[in-house]
Curated annotation (Swiss-Prot):
SMART domains: PH (SM00233), RhoGEF (SM00325). PANTHER family: PLECKSTRIN DOMAIN-CONTAINING FAMILY G MEMBER 6, PLECKSTRIN HOMOLOGY DOMAIN-CONTAINING FAMILY G MEMBER 6. GO terms for molecular function: GTPase activator activity; guanyl-nucleotide exchange factor activity. This is Pleckstrin homology domain-containing family G member 6. Residues 73-82, 529-538, 625-635, 748-762 have a biased composition (Basic and acidic residues). Residues 161-353 form the DH domain. The gene is PLEKHG6. Keywords: Cell projection, Cytoplasm, Cytoskeleton, GTPase activation. It comes from Homo sapiens (Human). Residues 63-91, 529-677, 690-730, 748-790 are annotated as: Disordered. GO terms for biological process: regulation of small GTPase mediated signal transduction. Residues 409-509 form the PH domain.
Length: 790
């Protein structure tokens, strides 16, 4: 911070500074004579920094009392006359003389502030502390609301009472802001100016006043954006104040008044710091007394000013309740109820933060009482060295499985005697926390207790009372619900035993409740995250079934299919005119069933696949879109199982082979689409197996089902699809039967609560979805899928 020199150390800037310089310059001529009186001939003279005080001596001894100077006076500066001799050289450097020198300098500075006003601070300090001229020009209000409403005499008594309540809200807001300005314009500005000349350097303005400037900015914004416009509207229209106009501002109360969280968290420490400084620092006490007697303070005490923000933030619900009580209109009552709820919700948040801060302080104090962690006796120095990194107990760490806002608390402590095994009884000191029980032994030479047993987690602890009225058994279990250790506890009295058992049971119940709440909250957040992801990109993300649906679906699937974790890869397509459906040459899975097929030739399977893709968009849609495709109603098969992950395939396919070689079947136009899509199912299974996603011998398979779109009639007749010698014709399972079972499976796997499809036409991709599909993305599905979803 820029130093603020005395009047004789160069020209000062500003009107007030020039007055101070002129005022101090009148006594420059007497500085040497004053120094001669204080320091006779041959006596060591103080350096210029220490001679600063002597320039003000004539002022202090002359007309100081006549000008209303404080009665605090400096000791006679001529001690040699009273003692009849010279003062020893050590007296000049004594702490008592330095204090007297600073006290007199403080007196002179404060008197200067009273006469000429507070000197201007640097611009950066004025901006930080909200100190400036003309900043409160808009914070004005009339004496009564009746001056703004000409027709107040014709208003009902109930409406007048409502206006009085609203007017109290406005006037108290301005009064409160002015009191906040006392702390910055008078106390903070005076302290900073004194520190610029080397006084009260040990006092921290940031610790004393906290974030009061942020509170001032918050209330100015609240007035300019919420309260001020309502008042201006009444001034312009002459109509009564409308509480509905305040609704938008009060609904965002938590965001606007967020600086109050920090202030309320530190208000106790701030007030304790102010009391300590006044009790131990006489110079600061004199400065505070001068501020409290200043005309701008309005006789406000420092501690009263520091507690004002806490009182104001808790007064808003009372003011709004007063307006609600006198508002007969239903619309106004609804708005006021919403405003009150928003304010009270923010106050609950502040109370929770304050309570959490107090709990953390209490935990830190309790942790200071816990000493070393010595639960083992190492046999050698080498073992002790290796154990040392793991012999630290941090009680301030968060509790496992519990929300972060909950802090570990010390619930009970006391001396007991414990017995483990056949050893004798040992005097110990127990600490019962929210989630753990510590067995410690007090140390005679230190105030800390040494941990002598591993921490006993409450969720694994069992307390059993014994026949002895003073004893109970502590059983600590492992993860397998087996005994890990057991302690026989002897309490001083039956009352102590009952208290230990009761507090332990209450702590276990509270811990179990907190863990259950955190588990439910995490599940809700996870479900919300999945829903948001599906809503953002429904065409590229797989659907996420509910927890119950996932469990039931997993039970009906085979182990082979439950291990499939497919990867969906969307590659970038640089050709704008390229078709959305890839050809067979870009897929290593298709065309491999016929080894003799050339790479560049078009097999019948290739033509069949393109026709199927054109006819049924379900083969190109994502899993979520497949579930929205309407299905043709078919009578249910009573002999078919209720839940099947895929239809059964012919025996030849189950053994890993392909369909037999045979003459091309003769089918009608109705069976053309179904038979062709049945072959696509087998092709999909074989393609997945070749890629390593499926086992070599799958037992079930899924497909996309029969298309609801009719055939165009333009397809050409195809030849034999699968050619392999050594197989006979298998006719029992027809393609339409397989597709019917696939439809039933897809219908049974619909997500509960999903909306029914409204249109049977295929969906069209938007430009944004197309751009997302063109980028290189790799999406790993975290749910096991069947072959139809691969």
């Amino acid at each position: 911070m820029k130093a603020f020199g005395p009047p004789h150390e160069g020209p000062l800037q500003g009107l007030v500074a020039s007055r101070i310089e002129t005022y101090g310059g009148r006594h420059r001529a007497s500085a040497q004579s004053t120094a001669g009186r204080l320091y006779p001939r041959g006596y060591p003279v103080l350096d210029p920094s220490r001679r600063r005080l002597q320039q003000y001596v004539p002022f202090a001894r002359g007309s100081g009392q006549a000008r209303g100077l404080s009665p605090m006076r400096l000791r006679d500066p001529e001690p040699e006359k009273r003692h009849g001799g010279h003062v020893g050289a050590g007296l000049l450097h004594s702490p008592k003389l330095k204090e007297l020198t600073k006290a007199h300098e403080l007196e002179v500075r404060l008197h200067t502030f009273s006469m000429f006003g507070m000197p201007r601070l640097p611009p950066e300090d004025r901006r930080h502390w909200e100190i400036g001229e003309g900043g409160d020009s808009g914070l004005t209000i009339e004496k009564s609301w009746r001056e703004l409403v000409p027709g107040h005499k014709e208003m009902s008594q109930e409406l007048c009472h409502q206006q009085e309540a609203l007017w109290e809200l406005l006037t108290t807001e301005l009064i409160y802001v002015r009191k906040l300005k006392i702390m910055t314009d008078l106390l903070a500005a005076g302290l900073l100016n004194l520190q610029r000349v080397g006084l009260l350097m040990e006092v921290s303005a940031e610790t004393l006043f906290g974030n009061v400037p942020s509170l001032i900015r918050t209330h100015r914004s609240f007035w300019d954006e919420v309260l001020g416009p309502t008042l201006e509207e009444t001034r312009a229209s002459g109509q009564p104040l409308d509480p509905i106009g305040l609704q938008s501002g009060f609904l965002t109360f938590g965001q606007r008044f967020h600086p109050y969280v920090q202030y309320c968290l530190r208000v106790k420490q701030t007030m304790a710091y102010a009391r300590e400084q006044q009790e131990t620092n006489p110079l600061f006490h004199a400065f505070v007394q001068w501020c409290e007697k200043h005309k701008r303070s309005g006789r406000q005490m420092l501690c009263d000013l520091l507690i004002k923000p806490h009182q104001r933030i808790t007064k808003y619900p009372l003011l709004l309740h007063a307006v609600l009580k006198r508002s007969p209109e239903a619309r106004a009552q609804e708005a006021l109820n919403a405003m009150i709820e928003a304010v009270e919700s923010f106050l609950r948040h502040i109370n929770g933060q304050v309570r959490q801060g107090e709990e953390q302080e209490s935990l830190a104090a309790a942790a200071q009482r816990i000493g070393p962690y010595e639960v083992l006796e190492p046999p050698s120095d080498e073992v002790e060295k290796n154990l040392r990194p793991f012999s630290t107990l941090d009680l301030t760490s968060p509790m496992l499985g519990v929300a972060s806002e909950h802090t570990r608390q010390l619930l009970l402590e006391g001396p007991v005697r414990v017995k483990e095994g056949r050893e004798g009884k040992l005097d110990v000191y127990l600490f019962l926390f929210s989630d753990v029980l510590l067995v410690t032994k007090p140390q005679r030479k230190a105030d800390k207790a040494k941990v002598i047993r591993p921490p006993l987690m409450l969720e694994k602890l069992v307390c059993q009372p014994l026949r002895d009225p003073n004893s109970f058994l502590l059983i600590h279990l492992t993860e397998f619900q087996c005994v890990s250790s057991a302690l026989l506890v002897h309490c001083p009295s039956p009352t102590d035993r009952a208290q230990w058992l009761e507090k332990t049971q209450q702590a276990q119940a509270a811990l179990q409740k907190l863990k259950a709440e955190e588990y439910v909250q995490q599940k809700r957040e996870l479900l919300t995250l999945y829903r948001d992801q599906d809503r953002e990109s429904p065409s590229t993300r797989p659907s996420t079934p509910s927890l119950e649906g996932s469990q039931s679906s997993a039970e009906g699937r085979t182990p082979e299919f439950s291990t499939i974790i497919p990867h969906l890869v969307v590659t970038e397509d640089t050709d704008e005119d390229a078709p959305l459906v890839p050809d067979d040459t870009s897929d290593s899975g298709y065309g491999t069933l016929i080894p003799g097929t050339p790479t560049g030739s078009r097999s019948p399977l290739s033509r069949l696949r393109q026709r199927a893709l054109r006819r049924d968009p379900r083969l190109t849609f994502s899993t979520l879109e497949l579930r929205d495709i309407p299905l043709r109603p078919h009578p249910p098969d009573p002999q078919a199982p209720q839940r099947r992950s895929a239809p059964e395939l012919p025996e030849g396919i189950l053994k890993g082979g392909s369909l037999p070689q045979e003459d091309p079947p003769t089918w009608s136009e109705e069976e053309d689409g179904a038979s062709e899509r049945g072959n696509v199912v087998v092709e999909t299974l074989h393609r997945a197996r070749l890629r390593g996603q499926l086992p070599s011998s799958p037992t079930h398979a899924d497909s996309a089902g029969e298309s609801p779109w009719e055939s165009s009639g333009e397809e050409e007749e195809e030849g034999p699809l699968f050619l392999k010698a050594g197989h006979t014709s298998l006719r029992p399972m027809r393609a339409e039967d397989m597709l019917r079972e696939i439809r039933e499976e897809l219908a049974s796997q619909r997500i509960e609560g999903a909306e029914e499809p409204r249109d049977s036409r295929p969906r069209k991709l938007t430009r944004a979805q197309l751009q997302r599909m063109r980028g290189p993305h790799i999406i790993q599905l975290d749910t096991p899928l069947s072959a139809s979803e691969v």
